[in-house]
């Protein structure tokens, strides 16, 4: 079953590109034609390329990596936050701070400061300060939360970026390119697809189009997380079964001249005492 259908794409208006005077020639291969001065995107290409992107995202998250959702334009902000939270990923939906990837250590210091302020509010220690200073600290916390709240728990660089509007988020894309972080993105008719590892040709301005594609990318993340959990559970069960099968009193000796270790099965030992 296809992860996204032509009908869904048409209903969401994903096929509408920009005006014909605003386009990037590199997008020519993804354009079906023009109507009333508007480019029409070839949705057959969109379906195929989205399937490829979906598989990549699923595999990335399934291997233990995270995807950073990026979309700061007004039409994308709510969707980016909602869908990233739904699938347990990180997001930036207000402002991309330069160096967020390439200077991650410095950004991490600001995130640590946000956590420090959160802790002060939670335990009430912020109330020890004068009223004026409390207002300053709360203002600092609000600003940090607005810009960095979506990556508060991101301990390391993401395994991939998902971007809405690569023109607007060009700094994010270039930083990812520089670090070799794969980018999945909606590419409208005015975008440069060469900068994107997994382009999804489509309308990056309409709210319905953004929501449809972003929700499907979030579905891919959720599927990847399920696969990861299943793999981890299977590995755990395998280790537990192997431990149970070790005969009581079996002696294992390392090939090196280390100590001899006796593996004792406590269940079997208890049965013998009875």
Swiss-Prot record:
A Pfam match: Ribosomal_S2
Database matches in CDD domains: RPS2 (cd01425)
Record's GO cellular component terms: cytosolic small ribosomal subunit
Taxonomic superkingdom: Bacteria
Example of a GO MF term: structural constituent of ribosome
Keyword Ribosomal protein belongs to the record: yes
Keyword annotations: Ribonucleoprotein, Ribosomal protein
InterPro entries, alphabetized: Ribosomal_uS2, Ribosomal_uS2_bac/mit/plastid, Ribosomal_uS2_CS, Ribosomal_uS2_flav_dom_sf
Any one GO BP annotation for this protein: translation
Family in the record: Belongs to the universal ribosomal protein uS2 family.
PANTHER family on file: 30S RIBOSOMAL PROTEIN S2 PROKARYOTIC AND ORGANELLAR, SMALL RIBOSOMAL SUBUNIT PROTEIN US2M
Protein name per UniProt: Small ribosomal subunit protein uS2
